[in-house]
């Protein structure tokens, strides 16, 4: 309502981009990982159709929960590898050229949190300074999440343009 934010009275918000940072639960089983690439493509089409924005910029943060040290790759043929491949494949869809950007998140890892994690229970006071969760949530590392957010923001700015 205009009464809640008077400075924005009459302003119509615009959705300028869409950010996808999901995929962990999709790596399990056989069906979801195998269908991830096709599903990702359908998601982009559906979001754009539903929002009436045929070229809406889309940024995808590829699953990276396997890559604590920043250099690891998911096990070949694993559900994780299939999900990540499906996410990154959106960079190569001709109709998405210049409007979709997917990037890997494992290289952005927090190496300090990764080094402490194996002994987090014994060194809890040290651990809670750098992490707050298990590996499937990027170690709960604010550094890792902020790097992902920065990379996503930079990718979106490139897609949206000046």
Regions found by a protein language model. Give the residues of each.
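Cell-envelope and extracellular/periplasmic
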Residues: 1-162
């Amino acid at each position: 309502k205009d009464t809640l934010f008077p400075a924005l009275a009459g302003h119509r918000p615009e959705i300028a981009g869409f950010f996808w940072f999901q995929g962990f639960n999709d790596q399990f089983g056989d069906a979801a990982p195998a269908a991830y690439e096709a599903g990702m493509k359908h998601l982009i089409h559906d979001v754009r159709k539903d929002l009436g924005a045929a070229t809406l910029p889309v940024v995808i943060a590829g699953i990276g929960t396997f890559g604590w040290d920043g250099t690891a790759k998911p096990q070949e043929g694993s559900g994780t590898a299939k999900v990540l491949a499906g996410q990154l494949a959106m960079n190569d869809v001709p109709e998405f050229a210049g409007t979709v950007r997917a990037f890997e998140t494992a290289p952005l890892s927090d190496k300090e949190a990764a080094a402490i994690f194996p002994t987090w229970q014994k060194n809890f006071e040290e651990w809670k300074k750098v992490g707050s969760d298990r590996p499937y949530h990027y170690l709960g590392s604010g550094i890792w999440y902020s790097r992902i957010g920065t990379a996503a923001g930079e990718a979106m700015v490139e897609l949206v343009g000046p």
